[in-house]
């Protein structure tokens, strides 16, 4: 059979596995970016804390995570997390998810920090001169405007995470590349399932990138 016929055969026989892999990939990415955004917001606040020790710890965490390969982090959490808490034996999926969340948080914190810094400093000064506290200024003036810079960047982080979850296949967590290993082992085909999975990844990331571009244009239009 030719490559095209093999692709048709794989879709017909293993379509459910490709769909399952897509579901797991999206699930991993969504949960990672959601909780990564929450933790990243906390890190961004801590990095601007007035206490040096707090700033130093958050900065060190961000730099260490961003300065080490994500695959290394996945390995560390896969083998460390079950041993770290006595009596708690998380599944491989949970271990990998925690590692991805902590990785994403470091990058999201910088996204949020950049979004906040993009807001005109003059507005902060005006708000403080009108009697608003630093906290009130941040939540009532700065953050509502920073959102238009942050949201598109978070969309790009989600797209990036879809691709990075492919590394989780090393631990067989059900994502697209895990399904590739299953299908390839059952059929002894390599190129054809990779082509199908490549198309799925492209469709996901391309459609999402277009959505992010539309969101970014609308955010910019709202500035006028």
Task: Give the predicted meaning of each segment.
Residues 1-224:
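Transmembrane alpha-helices and adjacent helix-loop boundaries
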């Amino acid at each position: 059979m030719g490559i095209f016929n093999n692709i048709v055969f794989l879709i017909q026989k293993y379509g459910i596995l490709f769909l399952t892999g897509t579901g797991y990939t999206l699930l991993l990415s969504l949960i990672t970016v959601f909780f990564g955004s929450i933790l990243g917001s906390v890190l961004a606040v801590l990095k601007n804390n007035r206490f040096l020790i707090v700033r130093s710890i958050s900065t060190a965490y961000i730099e260490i995570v961003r300065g080490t390969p994500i695959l290394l982090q996945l390995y560390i959490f896969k083998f460390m997390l079950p041993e770290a808490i006595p009596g708690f034996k998380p599944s491989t999926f949970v271990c990998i998810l925690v590692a991805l969340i902590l990785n994403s948080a470091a990058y999201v914190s910088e996204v949020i920090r950049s979004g906040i810094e993009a807001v005109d400093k003059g507005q902060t000064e005006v708000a403080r001169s009108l009697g608003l506290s630093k906290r009130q200024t941040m939540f009532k003036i700065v953050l509502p405007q920073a959102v238009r810079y942050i949201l598109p960047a978070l969309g790009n982080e989600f797209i990036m995470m879809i691709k990075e979850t492919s590394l989780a296949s090393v631990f067989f967590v059900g994502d697209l590349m895990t399904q590739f290993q299953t299908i390839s082992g059952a059929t002894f085909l390599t190129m054809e399932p990779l082509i199908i999975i490549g198309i799925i990844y492209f469709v996901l990331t391309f459609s999402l990138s277009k959505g992010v571009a539309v969101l970014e244009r609308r955010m910019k239009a709202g500035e006028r």
